[in-house]
């Protein structure tokens, strides 16, 4: 089973906490021990926002700010690589070809951002499409997809299951509201819809949830099912030991 795991920077390393990075590395190693091929994409989180904010005050333009964000995601990727040790490719992949090659030779591929103007949400979806992944999992700081930003709307509805087309519509609505934050961005949602990759969005602050979702189909997040299929999201779990 080929899996792409997208880990938000604030989920992986809040405050650059080594124990949290180690715990996520342990979760990924457990997946590979169970026979999964894994590609991990790491976001920038609060550290990236801090750097971008300071650079903006110093007069950097938007492309330069995006480049700083990409650089920080790759630093976070290096933290995860350090925790994974010899099971991971030794440096962050800088494009999808490098990541795919690492996965084919049996390494854990780890990458951050790729180009300016594209989030690691979208990078994760593109990597899943490029590698023909069986599953794309977003480990975020919220427990799935809601009808609105749950941090802004206490009455936001939590979805346990939706189609990729419905995901696109929901994310588009959320992103129209200034100040609201979606668990994945609109480009990522559109790539998920195009590729038909099965997707889970969940709260990944406890990395055990990542393992349980991938290996056993057990989670409290949101299953995103390819349009036009009625197959259960957790169809692969029956084949796990």
Swiss-Prot record:
GO BP: 'de novo' CTP biosynthetic process; UDP biosynthetic process
Signal sequence region: none
Pathway, per record: Pyrimidine metabolism; CTP biosynthesis via de novo pathway; UDP from UMP (UMPK route): step 1/1
GO cellular component, one term: cytoplasm
Reactions performed catalytically: UMP + ATP = UDP + ADP
Enzyme class name: transferase
Superkingdom assignment: Archaea
Chain sites annotated for binding UMP: 44, 66, 114-120
Keyword Amino-acid biosynthesis: no
Binding site for ATP: 9-10, 45, 49, 140, 146, 149
PANTHER family: URIDYLATE KINASE, URIDYLATE KINASE PUMPKIN, CHLOROPLASTIC
Protein name: Uridylate kinase
Organism: Halobacterium salinarum (strain ATCC 700922 / JCM 11081 / NRC-1)
Gene: pyrH
